Amino acid sequence: MRPPATPPDPTKEPGCKGTTRGLRKRGLPLTPEPGEGGGCSLEARGCEEESRQKQRMVTQASGREETEGDKLAKENGKITEAPSDDPQPGTDLVRKTSITSSESLQTVECSEFQNMAFLQSLDKEELGEGIKRRMRIKKCKSLENPPLEITKNEATQNIKVEFQDELFKNTPKHSCNSLSPGVEKNCSFELHDYSFLHSEGCNNENNFEDKPHDVCLHTEENSLKLKKENLRNLAEKDDTRTTTKLLKTEKSVIASKLLLEESHLYQNKNNGLTSCLQSEKNKYSVEENNTGRKHRKKMKSGKEEKNINLTLSNVCNNSVLVLQENQMGMEGKEAETLEPKKSFLKALRKINHNTLPPVDHLCLPKTVGKTSSRHHINAMLQKTLESSLKEDIKNTSESLGCKRIEPEKYNKSMISSTVKSPSDGHHMEKRSPRGDLRSETEESKVSCCRTIPMTGKRVWPFYSCARISAQCWKKTSLSDLNYSLLGPLENVRQHDSIIHQMNQTHLPDSKLLQPSLTERTTESSRKEMYDSDLSCLSSVSSVESTVMDIKEAMSHDKKTKLEEPSRNGAEVVSNATEDTQLSNITQSLTGNKKRKGNLSKLNLTVASQESQETNNCANKTVHRKVCITKQTLVAPDLVKILNTGRLTNFKIPLLKNKTGKRGAVSARSSEREAYSPLELLDSLSGVEAKQNRNKENICTTSGPQSLNLHSCIAPGQASSHSFYNKNSCTSSSFTKKGYDNKACNHISEPGNIISNKESISMKIENNTFSCDLGYIDQSSFCSKKQEAFVPISSEISGRKMTKSISELKLGFPDILKAYEDDVLLIDVIQDDPELFGISSEGDLSFASEVSKISQEPRVSEDQPTADFKHMHLPGKKEPGDLSKEVALLDPGLLKLESCPSLSAAKEPQHDPEGAAISLEATEETVVSGSLEGLSEQARASDSDAKCISSDKATVMEEQESTHEIFKSKDSRNVESATECQLATLGPNPLCSSALPVNLSSHQDVVSTPWINDVRFPGRHSVLQLQNPETCEIFKREKNMGVFQKPLGLLIPHRYCKLHFNTLRGCERAQCKFVHVPEQGDEKICMDVFRKYISVNEQRLLHRAAYIFLEYYRKFPPGIHFSLQVLNDLLISLLKHCLLKEVFQVVQLSIMAKMLPALKILLKIFEYVAAMKLRNAVPALIEIFCKFIEAGMVPDPEHLNYIVKLLHQAQASQQEISAVLQAKSRLRVRQLKKNWKCDLDSALSEVETCKEKSDWTKLGNLYISIKMSCEEFADLQRFCACVAETLTEDYKEERPGVPFCEFAETVSKDPQYSEVDKTLLGRIGISAVYFYHRLLLWAKGRKVLDILYELKIHFTSLKGLTGPEKEAPRCQIVNVAAEIFIKSGSLDGAIWVLRESEWIINTPLWPCDRMDVLNRHNLLCTIAHEILGKNLYKQTFEVLRNLPSFQNSQEMMGVSQSSLLFNELLDACIESNSLGISSSVAEFMVAKSIPIDFSFLRRLITSLGRSCLWLKARAHYKSALSLGCYPPLEGNLHRKLLLVPSYLSEIEMLLAMEIFLVSNASGIQSAGMGAPTQVLQIVLKRCEESKSRSKDEYQAAVERLVMAARISDPKLFIKHMTVNINKEQVYSLEHCSALKWLKENMKWAGKVWLFTNH
C-alpha cells in the first residue's frame, strides 16, 4: 500500500491533474485519498484493511482488473475531486455516507480484486440469470407499482440490506470498512462525482473495453461466484450479523459511491481521508497510469492489453461494487430486511448470465471485472441498487420537489454512478490519497489527449485513434452509454458528476461547491427523472444489461428505460444479463478493443453526462447524453467504441474491426458519427450504418432543436436522444445541452420518457434513428407538449432519414483516411490540425443540417429542476467572437453552431438551473483536465445562465448577452466551462455552438468543442495552438474555406469570400481582401443583403448591417439601391431583436435620403412598446422626427397609434408632446398639400365668397391659406385681395360689415397669432378708409370697434390697398378719430389719439401740413366738445397735444388755442377746479398763451382763499411779471406802499408781504435801537373807482384791514390821515411787522426777493 499522500489543495488541482495524467500514462491505478475515509468508524477501518488485503490478492490475481480498477479509481478520483459547494438538505447525511462508502469502497475494492478470480470462476450463467430475473422482477414491479418511490424505497432498502449482507459475507474483510456517516452524507455529491466517475470511467471503461468480452466473462463468473458465496454466507449468517454487515456494507457502498463524490468534497472539505484511500488510489492510479502509457505507446501485447482490460474491469467492478455497496449501505440502513438479498443475487445472476454491453462494461463490466468479493459486492449492489434505484428514483422525484434525497433515490443515483464507474470509485479511493493522481485521472477522463511534454499539452480529436481516453467523450460517451442503459436518471447523475468533475478540474473554486448542493441538484433532477421514469426503474437493470433488454423494457414500459438508466449504476450487472442484445452488440464492438474501450468511456461519459444533465436541469447534458445513449442502444458496438476512450493496447483499428472502437471516437467528433464509419460498417449494415450516421448528423444538426426538445424530454427521452446523438457525435453533445435543460425540466413527466423510449426501442431494432430524430424534432417543436413527441419524431425521423447514404456519408471523414491521419498524428505530428478538426465534408454536412434544424422552432424551457447556487457564470462574449472561437475549435461545427445558435437565439428559452448545471459540469470537467471542453461548456452554461438572468421581454438583450458570454475574454470561468464542455460534448460541438447562441435554451448556449486537451490562456475559450506550424496549417485550412460552407454568392476576386460568402465570416487578423464593397459595387451590396436576409441568420444580419453602414457612410445610394431590400433588412433585424442595428441603419438611411417604409417605423414602435424598452424611446423619437423632417407624412391614424404605443412604452410627456407637435406640423403640411399652395385658386375662392357674401368662409379660407403658404409675400397678396373684397362689397341695404365677420372667424383660429393681428389690422385700415371716404361713420366705427376688441394696434400699421397703403400715421389716426367723432364717440377718438400717442409728425412717421392742420382742427373740435361736457382734464389733454405745442415750428392755430385755454381756465375757476386751473394757467404762462388777467386774478384769489398760498404767490408773481398789477411805486426806502383799492384781500396781503420783505432791514434795525421809520400804506383810489360810490372804497378799506388780520402773525395797521386825493393812509405797527419778519422771513425772502418783478 502506498503511504497516504496529503490531500491536494483545491488550488493545486491543476497540478494534481498533471500528476494524474502522468499516472494514467503510466497506467498506474489511482488510489483514493484516505482523507475521504477520515470519517470511517473503527469497524469501517477494519473492513478497509481487509479490503486492502483482498485488493492485494486481486491485484496479484489479475493485472487486467487492476488496470481497469485504476481507471475506475481515476474516475473515482475525479469524482472525489468533484466540487461540492452549497450543500443542500440532506447533504450532511449523504456526505457521511459517501465517506463511509469511500472506506468500504476501498475495502470492497480490495475484496473485489481478491475475489476477481473467484467471481470469474463462479457460474457465469447462473449468476447472470439470477440477476436478470431480479432485474425483470424489478421491471415488473416498476410497471405494476407506479408509485415506485415507496415500493422502490422498500425494495431498494431490502435489496440494499440483502446485498450488503451478501456483500459483507462475500467480502467480510474487505467490506468491513464502512465510511462514517459523513461519507454517507456525501453520497449525493458522490452521485455527482459518479457522474464524473463515469466520465473518468470512460477512460477506465475504455481500458476495460480493451477486452470487454473477458471483462464480461470475469464479471459473470465473479458475479456467479459472488452470488453463490453470498448465498452461502447468507445462509450462514444470522440476521443480526447480517444486518450489521449489511449496514457496514451499505456504508461501504455509500462510501464508495460518495467517495467518488467525496473526492471532490475532499478537495473542498474532506482533507483527512487520505490514509487508506490514498494507498489504494495511488495503487490504482499507478496501474491506470501504466495503462495510459500502454495506450499511448500503443502496446500491442495481448497480455498487457488483457491485463489492462482486466484491471480496468476489476477497477470498474470494484468501483461499481463499492458504489453499489455504498448505495446498499445507505439503503440497508433504511431497510435492514434480508429479502433484498435474493433480488440482489438474482440481479447478480442476470449480470453474470448476460454479457454486458459496452455500456455495461462501462458501468457494470468495471464492477464485474473486479471479480472476487468486489464482484459479489457488485452483484449484491446491483440487486440492492435495483431496489435502491427505485427508491432513489422515488426519492429523486421527491428531491426534485425540493425534498431531501431518499435513500432509494440516492442509492439509485449512486448506483447509476457506481455502475458507470464503480471501479472508478475504487480507483478514486486509491487515488484520493494522491490529489495529483486524482486530478490526473479526472483530466485523463475528460481528456483524450496524451501526456505532452512540459512544453504543453496537445489536444486530440474525439474521433482520433490517437486518443487514449475520450476527454469529452469519457464523460459524454460514458454518460450517454450508461444513460442508455441506466436511463436518464443515472445518466443525469453521471452527467452531473461529470459536470462537477469538469468544474472541479477547471476551477478549484468549483470544488468548494458543496457536493451536497450538487448532489441535491442532481437528486432533484434525478428525482424528476425518476418521477418520469418511475415505471421504468424496475427495468433499469435489464436495460442496462443489454440494448435488447432496453428495447424490450422500452416497448413494454417506456418508463422502464428511464428507470433503468437511473438504476443503471447499480444494476449494470443485471442489466448486462437482460440486455443481451445490447451486450452482444457491445461484445461485437468489443471485438475492436480500441473502439470498445472508447465506447465504454463514451458510455460512461454519456451516462454521467446524462445524469449530470438531469441533475443540472440544463437538459443540454441530458440531451447529449440521451443522444449518446440512443446511439448506444442502436449500435451497442458504438457504445463500445464510445467507451474505448482508453485502451491498454491501443491499436489503429482496421476497417473490419474499427466498427466498435472507431465508432466511439467518431461519435466523439462532432462531424463524425457517435461511432466511426468503420464501426458502422461492422456493427450495422452499410446502408443502415449510413442511415444511422445520417440520422446522427440530423440529430446533430437538429441539436439546437433537440436541445430545446431535450430540455422538455424526460430522461428516457434524453436517453434515446443521447443514443441517437451518439450515433451523430455532434448531436449527442449537442443534445446533451438540450437534454440538460429540458430533460431536467421534464424529467418528472414519465409520459415524455415513455414516448421517447418507445421511439428509441423501435428504432434501435431497425438500426434507424428516426425515433431519435423524431424525438429531437418533437422536442424542438413540442418541448412544451411532450405527448406530441412520438408522432413528430416519426415524421422528422422520416424526413431526416430520407437523406441519401451518400449525403450521410458526407458528414463523416473517410475512415481509412482518418485512420491514417490518426496514426500519423499520434506518432509523428504532435500538433497536427487533423486531431483538432474534422474533415471539411463532415463539417459542411453537419453545418448544413444543423443550420437547417437550427432554423426550426425551439421550445424554451422554463422548468428548472435543480437550483445550483454554487454555479459560476462564465464571462460574456460577443456572438462574433463566439463564432470565431468556435470556428477555431471546429470550423464546420462553427457553421452549424452559428446557424443553430442564431436561430436558437431567436427563440428565448429559459432554464436557469440547467444553465447552472451546465456551468457546474463545466467546472468539474475542468477539474478533469478537459480545458477546452470546459471552456465550451462554460460558454454554454454561461449562455444558459445568461438566459436565466435575462428577461423574456428582453429576448434580444438576452441573445446579445449569450453572444457576449462567448465573447468574454477575461472570463476564466468561461474558459474552463468551455473547455469542460469541449471535453464533455466531444463530437457535439456543432450543436453545442448552436445552442449557446440560443438564448432561450441554456443548453443551446453550450458550445461543444471538438478539441479536448487544449488549455486556454484565460482570454478566449478558443483553442490555443502552441505549435506555430500547426497554427499556420489551421489558419491555412480556415482561409481555404475547408471548414465553411459557401453561401452561394458570386463575389469578385478582390473581395473576401470568407467574409461575404460564409456564415462564420473571415477570421483573419489582417485580411488583405475587401470586407466592404467599393464604390460602384452597390449591386453586390444588394445581392449580399438579399442572401443574408434569405438565410435569416443573426450573425449574417449583423454583418449585413455592418456592410450597409460602412458602405453608405462613404457612398451615396445609386441606381442599384433597392428600398425593398432596405425594408426587408430592417424587418429581419427587428425580428432578431437587433434594435441597435435597426436604429443605426434607419438613421443612416434618413441621412442618405433613403426613407424606409412607414410600416417599418410603426413596427419599431410596436417592438419598443411590446418590450417596454423605455430607454429606447428617446432615440426612437429622434428617428421619428427625422422621418417627419425628411418628408414622411403619416396619417393621423398612424400618429394616434404611435402616441398610444408611446403610452404603452411609458414614455414621458415631453416625448409624447414631440409627436403631437409633429402632428400639428403635419396637419399644416397636409393643408398645404390639399390646397397645393395655389394662390390663384385661393383668390378665385375669395371671389366666390364675395359673391355669396360668405365672409365666414372667407375667414376659413384665410386660415387655410395662412397654413399652406410658405412665403409671407403670398399671404400678403392674399390678404390684399381679401381687403379689396371686403371694401368693394358695399351695399347700403346690408347692415353687417364684412370685415367684422371675417375678423371674428380668423380670431377664432387656435393658432391665432400676432401675424394674424397685423394682417387683420391692415385689412381693417383699408376698411376704415373705405368707410371714411364713403362717410359711413357707423360701419367705419364698427371696423374700429372690432379692431379695438381684438386689441389690434392699427394706428401703427398701414393699409394693404389704395392710398391707405402709403398713408402716414397721422392721417390714419385722424381718419379713425374723425370716424369716432362723427359717430359720436369722443372716447373712441381720444382712445385712437392716445393709442397713437398723439403723434403728429416725427422722423419715423412724417406727415404733411395738411395732416397737421387736420389734426389741429380735429383736436380743437374734440376739446371744444369735451369742454362742453365739463371734461376739463380731457380737454386740457387734447389742447395740450395740439400740433402747435408739439413742434415749435408749427404756430398755426395759436389764437384759436388761446381762446380754448382761457375758456378752459374760466370754466375750471368757475367749477372751482383749482388744480386744473392752476395747471392751465401755468401751461398758458409757459407757452406764452395770452391769458385773461381777470381769470388769473380770480385764480390767485381763489387759491389764497383756499389757503393754497404757494400756488397763489406763484401765480401772483407771474401776474406781476405779466403786468397784471401795477409796479411798486416809490422807493422802497421811502417806506410807502400803494395798494389799489380793486385788489382783493388776498392780493393786498401778498402786496404787504412783498412790502415787509423789501423793508425788512430797516424794520429789523429799528428794533436794534435805531430810529424807527414809519411804514405807510396808502389805499389808492382808482380812476375807475372814482366814479364808484363811497361804498366800494369803504369796502376796499375793510379788505385792507382784513388782509392785515389774515396775515400770520397778524399785522396791525393804524389810520393816520387822508391825503389830498382823499385816500386813506395807514401806518404799519413796527412791533407787528418785526414779529412777522422774524417768523416768515426765511420763506418770504426766498419767494419774493429772488424773483424778477
Curated annotation (Swiss-Prot):
* Expressing tissues: Restricted to testis, where it localizes to germ cells.
Cell compartment(s), UniProt: Cytoplasm, Cytosol
- Without the gene, what phenotype results? Males are infertile, while female fertility is not affected. Testis size is significantly reduced with the phenotype apparent from postnatal day 28 (P28) onwards. Testicular histology appears to be normal before P28, but then cell aggregates begin to accumulate in the center of seminiferous tubules. Sperm development arrests at the post-meiotic round spermatid stage, associated with increased apoptosis. Adult testes completely lack round spermatids and spermatozoa.
Which keywords appear in this protein's UniProt record, sorted alphabetically? Answer: Cytoplasm, Differentiation, Spermatogenesis
Instruction: Tell me which GO cellular component terms the UniProt record holds.
Output: cytosol
Q: Transcription regulation: is it a keyword of this entry?
A: no
Q: Where is the composition biased (Basic and acidic residues)?
A: 63-78, 423-442
Q: Which GO terms describe its biological process?
A: apoptotic process; ectopic germ cell programmed cell death; lncRNA transcription; spermatocyte division
Its transmembrane ranges are: none
Top-rank taxon: Eukaryota
Region Disordered, annotated ranges: 1-94, 284-303, 415-442
- Which InterPro entries has this protein been placed in? TOPAZ1, TOPAZ1_dom
Tell me the Pfam families matching this sequence.
Answer: Asp_Glu_race_2
Q: What does this protein do?
A: Important for normal spermatogenesis and male fertility. Specifically required for progression to the post-meiotic stages of spermatocyte development. Seems to be necessary for normal expression levels of a number of testis-expressed gene transcripts, although its role in this process is unclear.
Q: What is this protein called?
A: Protein TOPAZ1
Native organism: Mus musculus (Mouse)
Please spell out the taxonomic lineage of the organism that makes this protein: Eukaryota, Metazoa, Chordata, Craniata, Vertebrata
